[in-house]
Amino acid sequence: IVDHCEDPSQSFRGVINEGAVAERLGLRGIPNTSEDVCVARDLIVAESTGAHLHVAHLSTARAVEMVRVGKRRGTRVTCEVTPHHFTLTDEAVAEHGTHAKMNPPLRSAKDVEAVVTGIADGTVDCIATDHAPHAPELKAKGFADAPFGVIGELEKRLAVVRT
């Protein structure tokens, strides 16, 4: 099972990470719990059934820790992270606007640090681009209307990962 862990009832109409940046910009945030509750639920199901769970694009400290604990317990779980989720924080939204609107959203520095630690200690199994390009005219819209995703730049991902 490959899972994009997001609880739509919590992320509904959110456009960036819930926190100080969202408050400063007056934007509705997507809470970490939107990801965390789904990771917790699906780890329980995987452990109970013996199914293999692959969690796509982890982005929160708590989700990384839950996967770490699940692996220690013998749960058949793997996960991936994206280059933007271990190199950029939600502060990038203030500078880049809708070009930094993605799902899951860019998270806090604490979350980024946890993702980096997860890569370093082997909790994270692979790095994936989660490539979701959009035309510049679509990303030029306001936050409510601009799609989630990054404009092109697939060719830059390897350079980001290697630095």
Locate the predicted segments by residue.
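Histidine/acidic residue-rich metal-binding segments in metalloenzymes
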Residues: 1-127
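Short, surface-exposed, charged loop/turn segments at secondary-structure junctions
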Residues: 16-19, 141-146
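Gly/Ser/Thr-rich active-site loops/lids in small-molecule metabolic enzymes
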Residues: 35, 145-160
